Amino acid sequence: MDDAVSVLVVDDNQGFLRAARAVLEEAFAVHTVENGTDALAFLERRPPFPDAPRPAFVVLDFHLPDMSAPAILGRLAESATLRAIPVLVLSQADWDEDESAARAAGARAFRVKPSRVQALREAVIDFWKEHGDAGADPARRG
């Protein structure tokens, strides 16, 4: 899958990460981390991820144990390279405050975390089609 579109999925729920990998790996090169600290290290290519690929987009849980999505988005906004990466924020809660905070911090989209894995796959592919390379096949880089 060397030519697959790379996505970073950030969530503290290992079950969610396993499910996300299972349903997304047919269309994307999936990378996962469990917290905001590791997400930033991956994106900034710092240890323990100095050779991490630059993801085409990020799927980010709003509520992580070490920092919130807006805090992570704020750090991304400080980097000319990283601020261009589209971020889809997911949350268990359908709270307007969470969506407003995520969008104000730079999230391109906010969705309630789907309960069905197929719905997750559809949401991620739709996000990529809308915010990634225009008209790109999600299984190939444009």
Residue ranges of predicted features:
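Short amphipathic alpha-helix used as the core "switch/output" element in two-component signaling
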Residues: P70-R83
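C-terminal output helix
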Residues: S115-I125
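Short, glycine/charged-rich "phosphate-handling" switch motifs in NTP-dependent
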Residues: R108
